[in-house]
Amino acid sequence: MIVTTTSGIQGKEIIEYIDIVNGEAIMGANIVRDLFASVRDVVGGRAGSYESKLKEARDIAMDEMKELAKQKGANAIVGIDVDYEVVRDGMLMVAVSGTAVRI
């Protein structure tokens, strides 16, 4: 499945706009543990433990969105948007959305 942030796919014609699709993932984060992990892992300004959690949550949300698009008969998703929110008690939510299309 082709997934893109752009509104179209170069060299491909969108035959049908099917529906808006989305996916969400909420990951629990122990603030104290993550704070110490960040201090320990910071190399070149990057916190490896936190980045790993972000990637895991993003992958789960993207997979959920792709599966929904596939169930609706789409073979591509255009206009992808990825949002990150910290919700109560230090939990992280990743929400992705886009338009399921058939090319």
From Swiss-Prot:
Sorted alphabetically, which Gene3D superfamilies does this protein's record hold? Hypothetical protein apc22750. Chain B
| InterPro entries (UniProt xref) | UPF0145_dom_sf (IPR035439), UPF0145_YbjQ-like (IPR002765)
Superkingdom of the organism of origin: Bacteria
Indicate the family of this protein: Belongs to the UPF0145 family.
HAMAP family cross-referenced by the UniProt entry = UPF0145
Indicate what this protein is called per its UniProt record.
UPF0145 protein BCE_1095
